[in-house]
Amino acid sequence: WDITNFVWWVGIGHAGTLISAILLLFRQGWRTGVNRAAEAMTIFAVICAGQFPIWHMGRVWMAFFVMPYPNTRGPLWVNFNSPLLWDVFAISTYFTVSLLFWYSGLLPDMATLRDRAKKKWAKMFYGVAAFGWTGSTKHWQRHESLSLVLAGLSTPLVLSVHTIVSFDFATSVIPGWHTTIFPPY
């Protein structure tokens, strides 16, 4: 059930990314009402999905030994042929891009919170979180171009992550699950 749940949560994350990124790339004005929820849905779904490859290993407390670490027996590296390792790479990349896409949309809001904060520590916290956002035309132009780049990056990333996740089934030795149509499917 763990790999099935992994695929389900990745699919939920893909839905959030595609809703937000495709609507941004097609310049849909009504996107602003749903983009924050779709991007947050992606982040929380990817966090949930990221746990299932660890649970799939069977012994969660042994997850440490999957990572390469220095030892006295020479360098030990992970098995790059394992689809679970590629799941980790795919989910890590997908999570990073989704987090950047989500947080770049929060920058103007962080600046608003900074400007409305009454306490000094809150002003300082939101000032750091806003990365010096002032709302100038230059900042809005850069924000728009960054959002377009991240949306353009995350849309094909959805397809690549989906392909890597489907390799879990395409490369398995379970009868009935081995087929070459899974990665593009």
Residue spans for each PLM region:
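N-terminal regions that are enriched for targeting/export leaders
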Residues: 1-12, 76
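Hydrophobic alpha-helical transmembrane segments of multi-pass membrane proteins
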Residues: 5-9, 54, 86, 96
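Central hydrophobic cores of alpha-helical transmembrane segments in multi-pass inner-membrane proteins
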Residues: 9-25, 47, 98-101
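Flexible loop linkers connecting adjacent transmembrane helices
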Residues: 24-39, 62-74
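Membrane-interfacial loop-to-transmembrane alpha-helix junctions, especially the N-terminal start
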Residues: 33-40, 149-155
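Hydrophobic alpha-helical membrane-insertion segments
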Residues: 42-56
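Transmembrane alpha-helix boundary signature
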Residues: 53-65
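Long, contiguous internal "core" modules enriched in hydrophobic/ aromatic residues
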Residues: 75, 80-185
